[in-house]
């Protein structure tokens, strides 16, 4: 147990220490300053030339968003065609079949919005070709889109008065060539060294120690897992995700993959500070996020290490903690840590079965996604926090009788309305979707969605919509979700949960940047203080967390009390 706790502490320290220099590097990339990866410039110029992109063009926020949405729409149709035709394409040594249109529709949406909620198993639901040219491609594109959107917001907030927020295409390309690809290459090499396969051979039949034959799936796993983690995507190469011994072979790869999930979202908080020259503000934002993340660890890890009280009553020793749904080579503490990391971001990959974790751990995982701004997805997580910042600035300004301003830009009714709609859309999608599904399940029990009725069954449905709306992708897998109903309902939540906030937040930044710059004065509300950070935290808890309390009370809290 002491070794497991030490592993959790080391992961936390490695994240906190290394995210700062990475954030400084990311800010330099988006500012166009010299970096050690400038040798990628010829490749980038080649991409601009082939795609007829003018890298010197400055876009306003409307043109910026149009480019972002169009590139996502194009690749959606690309993925649909390939998934529906994958059995006839090359690199299919196992003869896997085409996906059905509704499953292909759902898969493309899920991966296009950085969610990666999977209603299929990778070994049988995809071919090597579609793993590489749909899944891995989407994982790079969607992560780069989120980072590009944040880069545009940073440029808008750093400027005094401007209508230009940068070039989406340049941010998209640089996010890929100078941040995601180099880190993915490094992580991929370390995974191969530790036993993760990188092959295009088909399934192999082996004889186990018990003398039984077993079919082992393999493939280009080491190429896909790094961007799965670094891009906060989370879609597993194998059906059981990072619980699989070939996707996550040992304790070192477990720590590496867990670190990879959170390092860029953490770094983006610092990148904002370096970009706008407000490191103190970035430190307070980072501190609020880190406090919430660490608090979740202090709840979840002891819960999982403490074991299941029902098993205690049976007189069975639980020296290893609550091990239901967990891998022996990983352990209860590392599984709980991963659960917090994967839900505090929009990653959603798993190294254990979240459905089998104790009720309070499951509640914390849901709460992380329901709040949806503690680090979050690459780029998009900070943007969600930005919406709460705008609300906190507006409320604080009214409370103390000062004009609401953020970084020299007045926050007025229009920005406040957009921020409010962005913040309220998240609970609307989750609670309305869960309510409809609960009503359908109660009226038609023969459909067999729920393997666990009562409180835990409601928790499973609540978790599914929470994961979809937060673009997370993890799930309480006791729910039978590969049906047209769930594919369509959660597909709607995926689209709205991804694009509505991005459009709103980029619009807010563009509107703020176009206003006359107001220099700081004695009457300016300070946003880089403990008091304002506490105010922002309170706004997040009141507006986001408490919106879900009734649903949490009927689901995981009731589940815990009946444990």
Regions found by a protein language model. Give the residues of each.
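Membrane-proximal intracellular helices of multi-pass ion channels
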Residues: 1-563
């Amino acid at each position: 147990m002491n070794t497991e706790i030490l592993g959790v502490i080391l992961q936390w320290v490695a994240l906190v220490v290394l995210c700062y220099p990475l954030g400084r590097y990311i800010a330099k990339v988006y500012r166009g300053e010299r970096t050690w990866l400038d040798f990628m410039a010829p490749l980038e110029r080649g991409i601009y030339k082939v795609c007829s992109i003018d890298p010197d063009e400055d876009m306003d926020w409307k043109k910026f968003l149009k480019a972002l949405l169009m590139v996502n729409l194009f690749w959606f149709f690309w993925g649909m065609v390939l998934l529906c035709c994958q059995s006839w394409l090359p690199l299919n040594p196992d003869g896997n079949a085409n996906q059905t249109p509704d499953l292909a529709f759902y898969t493309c949406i899920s991966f296009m919005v950085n969610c990666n909620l999977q209603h299929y198993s990778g070994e049988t639901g995809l071919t090597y070709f579609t793993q590489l040219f749909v899944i891995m491609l989407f994982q790079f594109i969607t992560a780069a889109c989120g980072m590009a959107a944040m880069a545009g917001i940073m440029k808008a907030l750093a400027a005094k008065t401007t209508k230009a927020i940068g070039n989406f295409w340049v941010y998209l390309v640089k996010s890929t060539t100078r941040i995601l690809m180099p880190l993915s290459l490094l992580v991929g090499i370390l995974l191969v060294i530790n036993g993760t396969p990188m092959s295009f051979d088909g399934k192999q039949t082996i004889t186990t120690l018990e003398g039984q034959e077993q079919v082992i799936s393999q493939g280009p796993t080491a190429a896909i897992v790094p961007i799965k983690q670094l891009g906060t995507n989370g879609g597993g190469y194998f059906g059981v995700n990072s619980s699989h011994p070939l996707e996550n072979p040992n304790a070192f790869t477990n720590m590496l993959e867990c670190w990879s999930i959170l390092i860029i979202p953490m770094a983006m908080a610092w990148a904002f500070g370096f970009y706008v020259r407000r490191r103190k503000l970035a430190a307070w934002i980072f501190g609020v996020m880190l406090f919430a993340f660490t608090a979740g660890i202090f709840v979840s890890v002891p819960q999982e290490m403490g074991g299941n009280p029902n098993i205690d009553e049976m007189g069975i020793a639980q020296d290893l903690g609550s091990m239901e749904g967990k891998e022996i080579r990983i352990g209860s503490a590392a599984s709980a840590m991963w659960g917090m990391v994967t839900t505090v971001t929009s990653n959603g990959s798993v190294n254990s079965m979240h459905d089998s974790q104790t009720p309070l751990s499951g509640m914390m995982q849901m709460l992380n996604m329901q709040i949806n701004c503690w680090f979050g997805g690459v780029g998009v997580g900070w943007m969600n926090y930005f919406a709460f910042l705008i609300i906190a600035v507006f409320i604080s300004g009214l409370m103390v009788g000062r004009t609401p301003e953020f970084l020299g830009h007045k926050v007025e009714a229009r920005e406040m309305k957009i921020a409010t709609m962005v913040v309220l859309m998240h609970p609307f999608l989750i609670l309305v979707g869960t309510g409809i599904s609960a009503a359908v399940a109660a009226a038609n029990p023969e459909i067999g969605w729920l393997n666990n009725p009562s409180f835990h069954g409601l928790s499973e449905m609540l978790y599914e919509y929470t994961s979809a709306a937060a673009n997370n992708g993890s799930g309480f897998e006791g729910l039978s979700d590969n049906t047209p109903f769930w594919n369509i309902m959660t597909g709607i939540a995926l689209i709205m949960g991804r694009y509505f906030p991005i459009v709103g937040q980029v619009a807010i930044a563009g509107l703020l940047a176009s206003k006359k710059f107001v220099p700081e004065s004695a009457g300016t509300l300070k946003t880089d203080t403990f008091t304002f950070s506490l105010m922002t935290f309170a706004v997040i808890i009141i507006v986001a967390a408490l919106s879900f309390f009734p649903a949490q009370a009927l689901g995981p809290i009731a589940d815990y009390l009946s444990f």
